[in-house]
From Swiss-Prot:
PTM notes: Phosphorylated by host PRKCA.
Catalytic activity: RNA(n) + a ribonucleoside 5'-triphosphate = RNA(n+1) + diphosphate
Lineage, broadest ranks: Viruses, Riboviria, Orthornavirae, Negarnaviricota, Polyploviricotina
InterPro entries tied to this protein: RNA-dir_pol_NSvirus (IPR007099), RNA_pol_PB1_influenza (IPR001407)
Protein name: RNA-directed RNA polymerase catalytic subunit
GO cellular component, one term: host cell cytoplasm
Sequence ranges of Polar residues compositional bias: 55-64
Similarity field: Belongs to the influenza viruses polymerase PB1 family.
UniProt short sequence motif Nuclear localization signal, positions renumbered to this chain: 187-195, 203-216
Assembly and oligomerization: Influenza RNA polymerase is composed of three subunits: PB1, PB2 and PA. Interacts (via N-terminus) with PA (via C-terminus). Interacts (via C-terminus) with PB2 (via N-terminus); this interaction is essential for transcription initiation.
Gene3D superfamilies the record matches: 6.10.140.720
Ranges where the RdRp catalytic domain occurs: 286-483
Length: 757
């Protein structure tokens, strides 16, 4: 079905067409090779912004550290990180004055959460720097390794399962003179393959014990591993992002919990809400400014952009903020919250894999690991890399760079939003004490500023004052990249406002199409995406109908399941034709079995199996949904599954879709090649972990699962649960006396084994 694109724009107001200018179709750019160069850029830039600060040396690690706090006031428009402590504290005080009790209440909420959070909270999240192996791992594995090492070093608070107790272990681990860890290493040897008689490299994995002295351990505990941010659209250059290790994560989580609680109470904060809720919040602020700017007042809005937000923020400022916010709280709570910023003030950035060199003439390739950058002769490098390495050298220790100023990307989004909002809050007339006043929206580093004043000079004065106030707390509004407009037209976090929010539909484009999970899930996700966009993003009925037809076409090509009566020849067409001919009710065949498409924009909410169930031949129903059919997935199917969809910006979103278990909901098997690599040990750990969790869930069906109170291990919990259940089953006659006795005996044996261990 071909569409002439100009027809789409005949009746579209220009501002609605903005989304077509976004770089969101096609594949996003990915990075290849190492992120070492990007990381060095980040470290060097961060130090450059704070270069007039004071240098000190960390007594424990020997790392040189730069402290720009209370540094010189800026004299030009260059970005700088010289935040003034007293200004930040004053901004906090005014924020509290305009929102009485906000900090107090948020602290109380956070304290409750701190006491209830289980350590398994840290298994959420993707790649995490695993300090025991000195590389990235899935979060759950990294946590398991950390706890295992702590345990073998005599730290056992974490076994109670509360996150706060685990953090006590982290604190104690930093005082230890040495830590013993188990690391994996690879042995490679050349052997002759019996079958092919060729020489092949065989890899074996060994585990070895290694002792880290206090200094080496501290460096690892304070290390953030760095990677290149992938799939960033609309940028020419890539940039580095950081993943912290398990020691830092728990502390950051609690700080962000507190900051999130504060953000929820601030009308100018674009976090932590999203989607329609966020739009409503923003529209409120705009409405307030529009109604208050009577006929006599002008109102202008700046679509703001800050220069290098993260690199000019400073953990020492965050420490000052936390100290102020928690000032009337118990000592233990203040201590727990102040550790994250302190660790960040002493952080080390791991430089990644290093550089790859190749000699074209000799056909040689060699990797220069980051550890060697401190001592290698610079003549091998090109001009720009040489400059980078020269600048970073004084900061290097064991392949990591000391990075005291700056916050790596995405670490304290909520807390930095609180700082931004505190400056927006100073725009009230009672604080500006003049004819201009401002308000706005802040979401991490993105902001929109609305300034009202009786005339243009007043607007200019207001913007200048805002700009200078920001400078005092280390926020640098970019004069080049921010632009000002009459209020009513602006952009904030990729939402476009034009007398109301315009749907920026292009952002959703990447999530249209076939996901590639399996035939059943893909069909369901595809129609759900279209349905959601009709609800949330102004996807009109005609366009939705077209999107649906394109999706079905795409789906049929992906799975080679063209209609049974089609002329198209594929590998599956022979079988599908046969099925088509022997089916009485052809409308009942699923699209993936060569059936017709019965979806239209009215029935997108119904799973395809349900939509066609009444139309199916009986034997087809039996094959499709028979639990004894070996191709039907046997795990208990929830009625709702979660798919990961990729919107154009921001992290992958989780989207719910209806799941019906059929022969089409297969799960692909894991690639075998992983079994021959260094990851094999990790895979076994992961499977072990999985088995334990599955077993635990068998004992505690979700209905009876309460947050564990008191301190007991998973095994103890399961044993006591087994005893209770057995007794109830025995007394109600569901099990015989012999079975009851056998269960009790097994429980005792398990307890005995635990005691011996």
């Amino acid at each position: 079905m071909d569409v002439n694109p100009t027809l789409l724009f005949l009746k579209v107001p220009a501002q609605n067409a903005i989304s077509t200018t976004f770089p969101y179709t096609g594949d996003p750019p990915y990075s290849h090779g190492t992120g070492t160069g990007y990381t060095m850029d980040t470290v060097n830039r961060t130090h450059q912004y704070s270069e007039k600060g004071k240098w000190t040396t960390n007594t424990e690690t020997g790392a040189p550290q730069l402290n720009p706090i209370d540094g010189p006031l800026p004299e030009d428009n260059e970005p700088s990180g010289y935040a003034q402590t007293d200004c930040v504290l004053e901004a906090m005080a005014f924020l509290e004055e305009s929102h009485p009790g906000i900090f107090e209440n948020s602290c109380l909420e956070t304290m409750e959460i701190v006491q209830q959070t289980r350590v398994d909270k840290l298994t959420q999240g993707r790649q995490t720097y695993d300090w025991t192996l000195n590389r990235n791992q899935p979060a759950a594995t990294a946590l398991a390794n950390t706890i295992e090492v702590f345990r073998s070093n005599g730290l056992t608070a974490n076994e109670s399962g509360r996150l706060i107790d685990s953090l006590k272990d982290v604190m104690e681990s930093m005082d230890k003179e040495e830590m013993e860890i188990t690391t994996h290493f690879q042995r490679k040897r050349r052997v002759r393959d019996n079958m092919t008689k060729k020489m092949v490299t065989q890899r074996t994995i060994g585990k070895k014990k290694q002792r880290l002295n206090k200094r080496s351990y501290l460096i690892r505990a304070l290390t953030l591993n760095t990677m290149t941010k992938d799939a960033e659209r609309g940028k020419l250059k890539r940039r580095a992002i950081a993943t912290p290790g398990m020691q830092i994560r728990g502390f950051v989580y609690f700080v962000e919990t507190l900051a999130r609680s504060i953000c929820e109470k601030l009308e100018q904060s674009g976090l932590p809400v999203g989607g329609n809720e966020k739009k409503a919040k923003l529209a409120n602020v705009v409405r307030k400014m529009m109604t208050n700017s009577q006929d006599t007042e002008l109102s202008f809005t700046i679509t703001g952009d800050n220069t290098k937000w993260n690199e000019n923020q400073n953990p020492r400022m965050f420490l000052a903020m936390i100290t102020y916010i928690t000032r009337n709280q118990p000592e233990w709570f203040r201590n727990v919250l102040s550790i994250a910023p302190i660790m960040f003030s002493n952080k080390m950035a791991r430089l990644g894999k290093g550089y790859m060199f190749e000699s074209k003439s000799m056909k040689l390739r060699t990797q220069i690991p980051a550890e060697m950058l401190a001592s290698i002769d610079l003549k091998y490098f090109n001009e720009s890399t040489r400059k980078k390495i020269e600048r970073i050298r004084p900061l290097l220790i064991d392949g990591t760079a000391s990075l005291s100023p700056g916050m790596m990307m995405g670490m304290f989004n909520m807390l930095s939003t609180v700082l931004g909002v505190s400056i927006l809050n100073l725009g009230q007339k009672r604080y500006t004490k003049t004819t201009y006043w401002w308000d706005g929206l802040q979401s991490s580093d993105d902001f929109a500023l609305i300034v009202n004043a009786p005339n243009h000079e007043g607007i200019q004065a207001g913007v200048d004052r805002f700009y200078r106030t920001c400078k005092l707390v280390g926020i640098n509004m970019s004069k080049k990249k921010s632009y000002i407009n009459r209020t009513g037209t602006f952009e904030f976090t990729s939402f476009f406002y034009r007398y109301g929010f315009v749907a920026n539909f292009s952002m959703e484009l990447p999530s249209f199409g076939v996901s590639g999970i399996n035939e059943s899930a893909d069909m369901s996700i595809g129609v759900t995406v279209i349905k959601n966009n009709m609800i949330n993003n102004d996807l009109g009925p005609a366009t939705a109908q077209m999107a649906l037809q394109l999706f079905i076409k795409d789906y049929r090509y992906t799975y080679r399941c063209h209609r049974g009566d089609t002329q198209i020849q594929t590998r599956r067409s022979f079988e599908l034709k046969k099925l088509w001919e022997q089916t009485r009710s052809k409308a009942g065949l699923l699209v993936s079995d060569g059936g017709p498409n019965l979806y239209n924009i009215r029935n997108l909410h119904i799973p395809e199996v349900c939509l066609k169930w009444e139309l199916m031949d009986e034997d087809y129903q039996g094959r499709l949904c028979n639990p004894l059919n070996p191709f039907v997935s046997h795990k208990e199917i929830e009625s709702v599954n979660n798919a990961v969809v990729m919107p154009a910006h921001g992290p992958a979103k989780s989207m719910e879709y209806d799941a019906v278990a059929t022969t089409h909901s297969w799960i692909p098997k894991r690639n075998r090649s992983i079994l021959n690599t260094s990851q094999r040990g990790i895979l076994e750990d992961e499977q072990m972990y999985q088995k334990c969790c599955n077993l635990f869930e068998k004992f505690f069906p979700s209905s009876s699962y309460r947050r564990p109170v008191g301190i007991s291990s998973m095994v103890e919990a399961m044993v006591s649960r087994a005893r209770i259940d057995a007794r109830i089953d025995f007394e109600s006659g569901r099990i015989k006396k012999e079975e009851f006795a056998e269960i009790m005996k097994i429980c005792s044996t398990i307890e005995e084994l635990r005691r011996q261990k």
